[in-house]
Amino acid sequence: MSKVKLTKESIVALLTQGKDLEFEEDQNLVAFNFKTFCLENLDQIKKMSIISCLTFLKNRQSIMKVIKQSDFTFGKITIKKTSDRIGATDMTFRRLDSLIRVRLVEETGNSENLNTIKSKIASHPLIQAYGLPLDDAKSVRLAIMLGGSLPLIASVDSFEMISVVLAIYQDAKYKDLGIDPKKYDTREALGKVCTVLKSKAFEMNEDQVKKGKEYAAILSSSNPNAKGSIAMEHYSETLNKFYEMFGVKKQAKLTELA
């Protein structure tokens, strides 16, 4: 019996050779726990201002493309372009993104920071696409979560219900939200969130269900089609003139034609 390190070459040997192989214990895949990762790495982004955190979320896709072009280092952290095996302590773009969202949600506990986040995040395209009303701290927290990795964030204490309710909403409304199931499987994401909750023995007691219903009520009041209606209303005076040319009587509000 031979014990070897888990590498690409040793996996090939495992699959093609007749000799007995075992991987060294410390090389076995370690179960990743984002809650632990979060506690150990939140300090890495403590210098980021709230505005900078919001800038990251607003430009997430563009930032991701740049970071993934090559190994990306900030401070003492490096996000590798390619990795045969991502370890439990390695930083990835998704983990960084989740850290920033957790940081922002925690900042909503301060009224001044809450107002700053509320005013800035309202202009983010994803929030407008969801038609999410930003009336209180809970709605702002939902806004911060939009586009994030719910299975990762669900492992953090106090983030369980907001994650599972948002996952359910996305699964129920994926067509209205314009989510392509071939690119993002909402049911699979919900399953992953539930798996995380089960692994941490999370109990959906009466208090947790009450909290979940509050988040669900906010999401129920959102209007995924509002973005187009708002944009149409902005140009309503001019657009209505063209409607009249097509024999449609001018309305007080263009959105009434929808």
Swiss-Prot record:
It is found in: Virion. Encapsidates the genome protecting it from nucleases. The encapsidated genomic RNA is termed the nucleocapsid (NC) and serves as template for transcription and replication. The NC have a helical organization. GO terms for molecular function: RNA binding. It comes from Tomato spotted wilt virus (strain Hawaiian) (TSWV). GO terms for cellular component: helical viral capsid; ribonucleoprotein complex; viral nucleocapsid. The N-terminus and C-terminus are involved in homooligomerization and play an essential role in viral RNA synthesis. Homotrimer. Binds the viral genomic RNA. The keyword Ribonucleoprotein applies. The keyword Ribonucleoprotein applies. Belongs to the tospovirus nucleocapsid protein family. Keywords: Capsid protein, Helical capsid protein, Ribonucleoprotein, RNA-binding, Viral nucleoprotein, Virion. Its main location: virion. This is Nucleoprotein.
